[in-house]
Structures are given as structure tokens and as C-alpha cells.
Amino acid sequence: MTSINTANINFKWDPKSLEIRTLAVERLLEPLVTQVTTLVNSSNKGPSNKKKGRSKKAHVLAASVDEATQNFLEKGEKIAKESQFLKEELTAAVEDVRKQGESMKMASGEFAEDPCSSVKRGNMVRAARALLSAVTHLLVLADMADVYQLLLQLKLVEENLMKVRNAGTEQDLGIQYKALKPEVDKLNMMAAKRQQELKDVHHKDQMAAARGVLQRNVPMLYTASRACLQHPDVAAYKANRDLIYKQLQHAVSGISNAAQATSSEDSSFSQTAGGGELAYALNNFDKQIIVDPLSFSEERFRPSLEERLESIISGAALMADSSCTRDDRRERIVAECNSVRQALQDLLSEYMGNAGRKEKSDALNTAIDRMTKKTRDLRRQLRKAVMDHVSDSFLETNVPLLVLIEAAKNGNEKEVKEYAQVFREHANKLIEVANLACSISNNEEGVKLVRMAASQLETLCPQVINAALALAAKPNSKVAQDNMDLFKDQWEKQVRVLTDAVDDITSIDDFLCVSENHILEDVNKCVIALQEKDVDGLDRTAGAIRGRAARVVHVVTSEMDNYMPGVYTEKVLEATKLLTETVMPRFTEQVEAAVEALSANNGQPVDENEFIDASRLVYDGVRDIRKAVLMIRTPEELDDSDFETEDFDSRSRTSVQTEDDQLIAGQSARAIMAQLPQEQKAKIAEQVASFQEEKSKLDAEVSKWDDSGNDIIVLAKQMCMIMMEMTDFTRGKGPLKNTSDVISAAKKIAEAGSRMDKLGRAIADQCPDSACKQDLLAYLQRIALFCHQLNICSKVKAEVQNLGGELVVSGLDSAMSLIQAAKNLMNSVVSTVKASYVASTKYQKSQDMQSLNMPAISWKMKAPEKKPLVKREKLDDGQTNKVKRSSQKKHINPVQALSEFKAMDSI
């Protein structure tokens, strides 16, 4: 303990502690724990009546434990000898391990000689515990020695930071800063190594944040101190230097706490884990509404659920009442809150009606589904409200800063103070919106990053203002300008970090939807400003449109970096390029012309139609980008309330292919197949007709059998139905819309084929007739082959080309291959059903399915459809005078009905 006290280090670690704080200690300790545990469990516990004797296994295990202990002793002695810190404690710990190792060796040897003795087992268990404690203590002390070395380096950096801050001359400042830099680099390397070894994720994050602050603020301390020395009469420089130094002190404290795995008092380094509060409340509420009717109690559940919901609604109301929330969005949030309230009351009423029942009624399940849907709708409106804020606040984020710097360069301190207030409000708004985005996000890691970035931005804000005030005091000073540039760069970098972090926890779909609406609002404002000859309003709103368009391009381009290059990314990037290189320059040109014409007092006319067209193109360009991004979304992922599906009816202008789940120019792959030329459609129809013949054969075969006890018939029907859907796809019809749907259908067929193969082989294995057995196995092999073929052919591709201004769609080869593969598979299924029945008839009558360990397959003839001998006409109310179709009046001949029982030829 003397080494700790004399070093003047803030050491918060008790040397007697056995708490393991790093992965390295765990890794070193794990083999010994395993060996000791294996030895202790090598025979049954408690007294035994078995004959006493030697246990070879116990002797071997005891020897391995002793060997591991000796290994720890060698390493421990080396560490104690080489370590400059905790030498006495390490030496004592090594001796303790040696002592406990000898005790363990003796106890394990006695136990190995008499493994049935409970007394000797107990002695060995106690010795094992003591040995593990001693080894753990040694490893923890070695870990503490490493931390102690890091803390010494930290202390050295802290002292050097103080020397830089207190330097009396520029020459002294340069010397001290030059000495500081290598020490900071060394500390950073040691801290990074420690960060990797820490067990606790929170402490890892704490270390990373503190290291970042240290690296970022050291150069700023030098610049601020230099400015202080050159202009000691400017109070803002001194204030800035002190703020930076305080940040560095917090960083040093954060590294110290993280290295010792203790909590930090600084909120910027100790972010709370978990997602947003509102998101958590909604998730928890969705779980709480599902209750077992047997255990439902109105007195217990109603107050709890109502209280939780009102808490959620209070949070939603705060968001709705925020200044950036649009009026229509506010109304939607209020409406959704009322709907959620009503849905909860309906749900509670259903629970009361189902109380005491074992099973939930259909009405209760419907009420639960409706409740879940309403909370989902509320969640969506809250997300859109947050995106309103993000879209407005994270727009031209550098403008308040540039205005502030411009005022400072002019030396106008009064203006600087006014713009400083605007800048501070802007910074607070960014932080507020970032926290709002966190509140409805489930992305825990993302929320942590946003809150950390927001905290650092909050710290940087007063430093930027001080730098501007200092520049205003000495506008001609090179040092003052350099100081301002440094803080400007840091601010812009930190805002980018916060912006990217917010983008990561918000949905690009929501962002594009909201941005599209906002641009439409701004376009309308622009046109009104033009008509009212409001030059300032026109210029300001046009600037907002340019900023929104640039933000859309940035967000979408960043999102495309997450995808592999392909048709989808090409279409999206093509839309962004069109907006950036063609649409926006034209819009800017029209705005400049309009502003120039309105500013001139000579009554120069403005081409209003040209301006409106250019503005409309901006909106259309953003909308096209959004449509391109949504190409790969499924119908379930699309927000029906904000997206009109008819807008997807546009035609492709370029040559693309349907791959995976992609939509081409908003069209499904099925729709494109429907556009094939008539000659190709005729060929496909011919193939489909041939396929229908095979389908008829399968229908005739499976219709004979009752499928209630025959899985082979059930599987055959399923495969037939899926294959029909796949062939319908080639004609531009049916439920399958995209290539991914066809691929999914092929996988289902393959799964059904695999199950049929399993059933068929079980029948074949028990079939005594070798010829029947070989036939069945051959047909099963064909099913596997054709399932594989169908899987390959399912990746149907339709190509859309623009040749000489004429749209040409081609995809005949892939469609024909798909139909042919389905036809072959259908034929094999028919043959397999027949062969399975034939093989089943070969079993000896004395053997049943259970005795043969067979699956339950019962070959029973299907009863004919029940039909009345005399058709009775029902006279519905109000329908007495309705003329019946002649087919409904037709009487069924009883003999004909009985004849529908078709007997198969005996085999």
C-alpha cells in the first residue's frame, strides 16, 4: 500500500479486491478453473459403499492442476520482479499462490488415493477454493499494476497540460507543447489497449469518449493559450482557454475512471444505455396489453394500462406542441392519441368479457390486433413529427456560424453578441431535436452516439462564441483569426458527426416523405413570394429549397453506400444526379433572374411560368428520388397514408433487369411479364397448355384419394397449387408479383418435395417388391432433380429496353424454362403418387404402419361430393320472384351419384 500512497495517484482500486475487470484476466484464469472443477467433479459426492481404490483419472487431473499452478508461479515471480508498482503486494500474492498450491497438491493427492471419502473430498474442495482465490488475487494485482502504469502516464500528461496552460511566454508555450504531444500519444496508445481489454461495454464507451476529447482539445488548448499570451487584455481568450482546460481535466478523469472500471461523474462520458424513453414506453405497452384471460383482473390491469398510456400520450403531446411541428401533423398526433385511448377501452371491455376463459375469443384477438395497429400508427406519426424537426433544424447548419464570424471579422462587438444569441439558440435547437430523435428510436447504440455527440456540441458552443468575441476585439490579429478558424472547423466537424448520428437512428423513408412535403410547401411559398414581389421572402425560401435538396442528396447518397452496387443503386444515384446537375442549376438560374428583375425598379417582367416549371421540377426530382429509394420496399413496408401507389405507373426509360425484389420504374416484374410481345405470349400460352395437361393428370390422380390421412396427397396438392401460381406469373397474372416471390415459391416447392421424398423413401424401405421399390426411388430422384431445376429457373428476368423510342420487353427464354421445369416436376409428382400407392399395397396384411415404424399414410378412396337426391329451392326474403338458373333446378339421378365411387383396378 505504501507504493500507492507515495505516488500521489488517484487510485480507486482496493488491492484486496477479487473483482475481475478485464478479459485478459478471465482468459488466464479460465483453464485453471476448468481443471479444478473437473477434478472436484471427478467422482460422485458424498460417502459411498464402493470398494476403496486408486483413481487414475483423479491423479492425472491433480497433476495437471499442479502443473498449471507452477506455471502461474513462474509468471507471477517474473511480474513481481519486473514491476515497478505494487512490488510488495505482488510478491506476497505469489507466496500465497505457492502456499495454496502446496495445500491443493496434498489434498488432491489424498483424494486421488481415496476418491470415495467425503472428508477428503471436502478438504480438496476447500483447498481448491483457496487456490483459485489466491491465483485470482495474483492476476488482479498484475492487472492493477498495468493500470497503475497507465495512471502514472495520465498524471504526467495532466502535469504537462497544466504547464501548457500556465506558460508565461510564447517560447515557453512552444517548448511545453512539444513535450506534451508525445506523452499524449503514448497515453492514447495505453488507453486504447486498456479499452480493448475492459469487460464492461459502458466503460469501453467511457474510455473511447474521453480519449476523443483529449485528442481533440490538446491542439485547441495550445491555440487558445497562444492567443491569450498575445492578447492578455482580451477576457474572451482567457475564458476560452479555461473552458478547454476544464474539458481536458474531465477527459483525464474519464480515462482514469474507465481504466479502473469505475463510474464517471461527467455526463458526457457516462451515457445511459438503452433506446429512447418514448420508444421504450410504447414497446413496453405493446407487451403489457397481451394478458391471459384466466389471470385478467380489471382492478389490477385497467389502472396500470391506462396510466402507461397516459404517460405515452403526455410525451406525444409535448412533441405535438413543439414549434417545429406542422399543424396538420399536430392534428394527426391528437387524432391518433384519441384512437389509441378508444382502442384500449375496447380492449379492456373484451378482456372483461373473456375473464376466466382458457382461450381468447376471436373478438379479443381482433381487439388486441387493433390496439397494436393503433400504437403503430401513433408511433409512425411521432416519427414523422420528429422528421419535421430534423428536416427544419438540420438545414444549412453553418449559416448562424458564418454570420457570427462575419460580424466578428468586422469588429462589431454589439452585432457579435446579438448573433451569438442566435447561434446559441441554433445550437440548443440542434441538441433538442437530436434528443427528440433519440426518444422514439429503438437503436440503443445509435442513441448512445447521438447523445454523446449532442453533449460535446453543447460544450463546444460557448467556446465558439468566446472565439468570436475575441476576434471582434482584435479583428486584424492573425492569431485571433487562426483561433476562430480552428473553432469553426471543430464546430462544423461536430455538427456533421451529430447529423450523421441522427440520420443513423431515423428512417430514410420518413425523412424523404417529410422532405418531399416540406419542399412542396416551400415551392408554393416561392411562387406566392414571386407573385407578391417579395424579394427577401423569395430569396430566403429559395435558399431553403436548395438546402433541403442538397440534404436529400447527401442522405440518399450516404444510404446507397450501405448497398452493393447494382440496378437499384444505379437508379437511385441516377435520380440524385439528375436533381443535382440538371434541375437545381435551372432552379437557381430562375431564382436569380427573378430576384434581379424584382430588385430592379425599371419594371422588368418576370417569366412566371418558367419559374413555376423550374420549381415544380425540383419537387418532381425529390419525388423521383424517393420513388427510386422505395423500389425495393415490400407493400407492407410502404406507408399507405403517405404514398400513393398509382404514382408507380410510370414506364422505364432505360434498360434494366428484374433481380431479387426490385421493381422497375415502379412496376412489378409480373407487370413487365404482361407486356411481352404477342408472339412471345403465344409461345408461353402453348407451353402453359401443355402444363395444364399434366396438371389435369395430377388432379385426376389426387382427386381419387382422401387426403385427411395421407400426407403425400396433401403435399402433391400444395406443389400443384404453387406451380400454377408460378406459371401464371409468366403470363403477368396471379398472386406472385416480383422475382423474389417466384424464388420464394420455388423454395416452398423444394421443401414440399423434400418432405415427399422422406415419406416416399420410408415406404420404399419397407416394400418387399424390389421392382416397385426401384420405380418409386427413381421417381423420387426425378422430383429432387426437377425441384432443383425449378429453383434455378425461378430467377425469371424480364428485360425492358428502349429501342428507337419504342419500349421492348423480352423474357421468353426464362419464362419457357420455368414452365418446362414445372411441367416435368408435375409429371414426376403424378408418377410418385401412383408408385407410392402401388408400393403400399405390397405390405403383408399382418403388418400395419406402426409395426413397420411408418408414417401415417392411409390410402382411402375419396367419397363423392354429397348431393341431395331432390334439390330444394330456398326462397330468400325479397328474392321470391328471382329467376333461378336452370342448372340449379336440375335433379340428380341417385344411380349416377352412386356411380361416382370409382374403384381402382386391383394391382
Swiss-Prot record:
Organism per entry: Danio rerio (Zebrafish)
Tissue-specific expression: Expressed in the skin (at protein level). Expressed in the ovary.
One biological process term in Gene Ontology: cell-cell adhesion
The keyword Protein transport appears for this protein: no
Biased composition (Basic residues): 882-892
Consequences of knocking out this gene: Embryos during somitogenesis initially show slight deformations such as indentations in the spherical morphology of the embryo, additionally ruptured weak points are evident in the external epiblast from the 12 somite stage onwards. Embryos proceed to show tissue rupture and swelling of the yolk resulting in lysis of the embryo and a complete embryonically lethal phenotype by 24hpf.
InterPro entries, sorted: Alpha-catenin/vinculin-like_sf, Alpha_catenin, Vinculin/catenin, Vinculin_CS
SUPFAM superfamilies linked: alpha-catenin/vinculin-like
Basic and acidic residues: compositionally biased ranges: 870-879
Highest taxon, organism lineage: Eukaryota
The entry's keywords: Cell adhesion, Cell junction, Cell membrane, Cytoplasm, Cytoskeleton, Membrane, Nucleus
Summary of subunit composition and partner proteins: Interacts with ctnnb1, jupa and cdh2. Interacts with cdh1 during early stages of oogenesis, interaction is no longer present when oocyte develops into the unfertilized egg.
Annotated protein name in UniProt: Catenin alpha-1
UniProt-listed PANTHER family: ALPHA CATENIN (PTHR18914), CATENIN ALPHA-1 (PTHR18914:SF24)
GO cellular component, one term: catenin complex
Region annotation Disordered: where it falls in the sequence: 870-895
GO molecular-function term, one example from the UniProt record: beta-catenin binding
UniProt family annotation: Belongs to the vinculin/alpha-catenin family.
Major place of residence: other
Gene: ctnna1
Function: Associates with the cytoplasmic domain of a variety of cadherins, forming catenin and cadherin complexes which are further linked to the actin filament network and is thereby involved in cell-cell adhesion. Required for embryonic development, via maintenance of adherens junctions that facilitate the maintenance of the epithelial barrier.
Pfam families xref list: Vinculin
Membrane topology: Peripheral membrane protein
Protein location: Cell junction, Adherens junction; Cytoplasm, Cytoskeleton; Cell membrane; Cell junction
